[in-house]
Each structure stands twice: as structure tokens, then as C-alpha cells.
A protein has these predicted regions:
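Glycine/threonine-rich flexible loop motifs
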Residues: 281-293
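Conserved anion/nucleotide-ligand pocket segment
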Residues: 331-401
Length: 555
């Protein structure tokens, strides 16, 4: 084995134990090392590093309040993030005393090897700015490989739906087991002797389509005592308030948590040992199922009732975060916790975060999924899509929802009451040709706009002809949906200020500052840059609650 001497006075002074970041190899060999890390710890058929080791690399081992995060052997808070316009969202790096550096982006798979000797000839060299320039150029070039102009050539067809659904093509499919599937495979042994309250809806079903209600009702050694339903009811088909009822098949009472009560009462929870929660979030802050779960955690804590969350995928992947943190003044049912609009967590991870950050003294268990990776979009999991709510009918709509859902409180229809909610917007006073031209001129990555006319059957402008735009997703990886919503709102305000009335928006954006910036006519690109500190703060906070590592193969 070749051994080298680290050129690091600090390491030498302390006997070599700290500061040993020297890179004794060639760029080619270090490239192999980087590809091994990005490949989930494997090199060819060989498993070089375990998933536990990789997870330790991505987990903070330094105090989160000290402003500088490190995992096992890596910086998790590279300073280049703050100084680069086209930044990576999930970089790690390690540098050496002589100026060497490895830099990897877990999200995109980009890595950079920089070998130098800044100490030659007088020991006073400084390569920090050079390294920053190299990383900036490399990231910018990688980000620009698929430009909006190139993407638009794929969209020259009237078959919008087929193109829209092709964004996940050629993606490898995993065989993910939900928390319910895992619990079922264990024959519900964790629930032995328990009296169960089940908070679920139509999405609570196994891979083969058996409902959670039927599985718990038929399980040995436990008693399904009562049911709870979130917004839209136990079958997920209601768009208004839902009254409590009785399940026709099992005879159990269904306590609605979107009717007279938003929080479970002590009477509803009487006689229950454990509340099991099996709900599908959509990856967006104002989707209310996470709030219903949080209210259940709070109620269970007061009554010393245990809670078990059966985890399910974040449909729009568990890596991306985007948007401003929720202002404290907007905390409520559509915003339980100060987080960006696109949060990048699963329901189980959200439960852990809510419990810890809000000091909810509940005994909480999360049944993890098997096979799910943070990079996975829902169509890469092998799980069947079940509409989690009436107007969330496919993955494209879920992808657009963080942006289009954030502005639906304004005087526009977002397609509710049509076959393509959140894929189109319009109003009787919009000129679709004008709006499409204005939005396409923005050159937003991953999306194109086409003039469209539609008549909603229900919801806003029901029965009236609306003109607007159809939103065609051409690259879901490049798309930033919250930025998209911001651009749409700013463009509508500029073109139709009297009709749009943005000042009356109910602020699902969650930020008074952003609303003021749009009304003042500020550039949306500049507004989005102001979110970076919020996004960084959220990434740092959420790290301690991640149940699924970034370092993992797709399958």
C-alpha cells in the first residue's frame, strides 16, 4: 500500500488524527471513487461502502445551530452554495490544506475533482476563488444542457396529454413497499392486543389494492375500534365539509376531521390504545393531510395514546425543496409549520419533525417504506396511483401543484371542475394568446404554455367559458413549480391588474414579503433568489428527521 505524508501543519501538530484530508491519488482514480459514492456505495458488482456509512456521511454530526454542518468526512454546507447564482441544491465537499477538493452533487450526479498545490512555491497561495469559478462554470454548463429552446422542440404537437405524461419515461422502476405493506408482511405483530383507531382514506391500500380498513378489520390479535377521515372524506370524493358517519362494510364509526371538528376530541379517542395513520401527502405545504396528522399527534399526546404512521412516498421526490418559509401570521390548517411550499419530506418524516420541533410528547412509531429512495418520483415506485383528493388525478398535477395551487386563491380558475386541474389556468377576462406568449417569453426551464379555453363544471367560474393557458411539463427535473406559480402571478398582475386583484390573494404563498414584491413589480427571478436563505434553513432543519438516505441506488 502506498502511504503519503499529509502536508497539513495542523494535522502534523496534533499527531495526524485530525485534518487528514489529503488526497493521495490521481484524478482518474478519484473519479472512480466519486462514481462509487454517487452509485450508492457500489463499484460494478462490488458493494464498497454500506448504506449505513453513506447515511452517516449525509447526516449532520455537528450542532445544527452553529451555522456549519459536517457529516462523516464531508462538509454538508459548502460555502459555494451562497455565492453562486446557478447553485446546486444538494452538494457536499471535502477540501485539503494544499487546496485539493472533491465536490459532489447528490441530486444531479455531478462531481468535480480539483487537485492542486497552493503551497508552491512560497506557501502563500490561495485557490479558493479559482475553485469557486470552476464549480460555478461546471454547474452552469450542466444546468444549461437542456435549454428551454431545446425543450420546446419536443412540444410541437397538439397531443398535449401524451407529451405531458412522458416526462418520466425510461426511468427505472423500484418495487416499493409502503408502510402498510410492511406491516401486513409482519402479520401486524406490532399491533398485538391493541385497540386501534385508523386515520385513513381511499389511498390507504396495499400494493395489491386491499384497503387498510379491510386489512385491520381482518387482522388477528387486534381490534379495529374506530375510523377517522381527513379532508374529502373516507373515500376522497368530497369537496365540501364532511359529516361523521358509519362505515357500511365494517359498521365502524367514521369520525370526520373535516367537518364540525378539525381536531379529534377526547370522546372520539376514548378506548383507543394506538392511532394508526395511513395518508398520502403530495409534497406541498398547504395540502391539509399533514395538518390533520399533526392535530392527531397533539390530541393523542394529551391522552397518552400511541401513534403509528405508515409511511408513503413523497410523490414529487424527497430531494427538492422550494419556496419561502411560511410567515408565522399564516400558520393554520393550510400551513401547520413554517416550511417552504415544496418540503421534500414523507408523512413519516413530517410526523417526526412535528413531534420534535413542536414538543409534542407522544409515543410515535413510523413504519418505514422498503425500497423507496429520495430521488424517486411516484411513477418510479411501482405503486398504483390512487387519487389522494378529487382534483389530484395524476403525477403531473402533483408536480405543478406547489406553484399553481399557491395562487388559486386569486380570481382565476386553476382547472378545478375540469379533467385537468392544475394543468391549466384561466378566467373569462384573460386573453389566452397574450398570456401564453408572455409566459413563453420567460423561457422557464421544463415547461411550455399553450392557449386554451375551458368551461369548469364546478368551483370557480362554473359554467362560464374561461380562456387561459395549458401548462405542458417538458422536463420535470428542470421545472421549479413554485417559481412557475410566481411567474404566472406576476404576469397576470402585469397584464390584468384591475381584473386579477392580486392584493386580495389569500396567500397560500405564505409570505407577505413575496406578495408585496409582486405588487411592486419586482422581477420574479430576483424574488425567487431571496428564498435561498429560507430553503437552506429548511434543509438544515429537516436533515435530522430524514428516514431515507440520499446515498442510494435507484433500485
Amino acid at each position: 500500500m502506498l502511504r503519503g505524508l499529509v502536508h497539513d501543519p495542523s494535522a502534523r501538530r496534533m499527531g495526524g488524527s485530525p485534518g487528514h484530508a489529503g488526497l493521495f491519488s490521481t484524478a482518474d482514480d478519484l473519479s472512480i471513487f466519486c462514481r462509487m459514492l454517487l452509485g450508492g456505495g457500489t463499484s460494478g458488482p462490488t458493494q464498497v461502502l454500506s448504506q449505513e456509512t453513506l447515511a452517516a456521511m449525509m447526516s449532520p454530526s455537528t450542532p445544527l445551530d452553529k451555522g456549519y454542518l459536517r457529516g462523516l468526512g464531508w462538509s454538508l454546507d459548502t460555502t459555494f452554495n451562497e455565492r453562486r447564482e446557478k447553485r446546486s441544491s444538494l452538494p457536499i465537499d471535502q477540501s485539503g490544506f494544499t487546496g485539493t477538493q472533491l465536490w459532489l452533487d447528490i441530486e444531479t450526479g455531478l462531481y468535480i475533482v480539483f487537485l492542486s498545490n497552493r503551497l508552491h512555491p512560497d506557501g502563500k497561495g490561495d485557490v479558493f476563488d479559482l475553485r469557486e469559478q470552476i464549480i460555478t462554470i461546471a454547474v452552469s454548463v450542466a444546468a444549461d444542457q437542456a435549454t428551454p429552446a431545446e425543450l420546446s422542440t419536443k412540444a410541437d404537437t397538439p397531443n398535449l396529454r401524451s407529451l405531458n405524461l412522458s416526462t418520466g419515461k425510461n426511468q427505472p422502476h423500484a418495487q416499493v413497499l409502503s408502510g402498510l405493506d410492511v406491516l401486513r408482511a409482519e402479520a401486524f405483530i406490532r399491533m398485538r392486543g391493541q385497540k386501534i383507531g385508523l386515520l385513513t382514506n381511499q389511498v390507504g391500500q396495499s400494493r395489491d389494492g386491499v384497503s387498510a380498513i379491510d386489512l385491520f378489520d381482518g387482522a388477528d390479535h387486534l381490534e379495529l375500534k374506530t375510523l377517522f377521515s381527513p379532508e374529502h372524506g373516507i373515500h376522497g370524493i368530497r369537496d365540501d365539509r364532511v359529516a361523521s358517519a358509519r362505515d357500511k362494510k365494517t359498521g365502524r364509526v367514521i369520525h370526520s376531521l373535516y367537518g364540525k371538528h378539525l381536531r379529534p376530541t377526547p370522546e372520539m379517542l376514548a378506548g383507543i390504545d394506538t392511532v394508526v395513520i395511513d395518508l398520502q401527502d403530495i409534497g406541498t405545504r398547504f395540502y391539509t393531510y399533514m395538518t390533520t396528522m399533526a392535530y392527531m399527534l397533539e390530541a393523542a399526546a394529551k391522552l397518552k395514546i400511541k401513534v403509528m404512521v405508515l409511511d408513503r412516498p413523497n410523490p414529487i421526490n424527497g430531494i427538492r425543496v422550494e419556496g419561502p418559509l411560511l410567515d408565522q401570521k399564516f400558520l393554520g390548517f393550510t400551513g401547520y409549520f413554517p416550511m417552504p411550499i415544496r418540503h421534500g419530506l414523507t408523512m413519516g418524516e413530517l410526523a417526526l419533525l412535528f413531534k420534535a420541533e413542536n414538543d409534542i410528547a407522544v409515543e410515535l412509531t413510523v413504519v418505514k417504506m422498503q425500497g423507496w429512495r429520495r430521488r424517486h418520483w411516484f411513477d418510479e415506485t411501482g405503486l398504483p396511483w390512487v387519487n389522494p383528493s378529487p382534483n389530484m388525478q395524476n403525477l403531473i398535477q402533483a408536480t405543478l401543484y406547489p406553484g399553481i395551487g399557491a395562487i388559486e386563491g386569486t380570481r382565476i380558475s386553476v382547472g378545478r371542475g375540469t379533467g385537468t386541474p392544475f394543468e391549466q389556468i384561466g378566467a373569462p377576462w384573460i386573453d389566452g394568446l397574450q398570456l401564453a406568449a408572455a409566459l413563453n417569453a420567460k423561457g422557464l426551464a421544463g415547461v411550455r404554455f399553450y392557449p386554451v379555453a375551458f368551461i369548469p363544471r364546478s368551483s370557480k367560474y362554473a359554467g362560464r367559458k374561461c380562456r387561459g393557458v395549458f401548462i405542458l411539463v417538458t422536463d420535470r427535473q428542470a421545472l421549479r413549480p413554485v417559481r412557475l406559480g410566481l411567474e404566472v402571478a406576476a404576469t397576470l398582475h402585469r397584464l390584468y391588474p384591475a381584473e386579477y386583484r392580486l392584493e386580495n390573494e389569500d396567500n397560500l404563498l405564505g409570505s407577505e414579503t413575496v406578495l408585496i414584491q409582486i405588487l411592486a413589480g419586482e422581477d420574479p427571478a430576483g424574488i425567487a433568489k431571496t428564498w435561498r436563505a429560507d430553503e437552506k434553513q429548511w434543509r438544515q432543519l429537516r436533515r435530522r428527521y430524514l428516514l431515507y438516505p440520499f446515498w442510494a441506488k435507484l433500485n
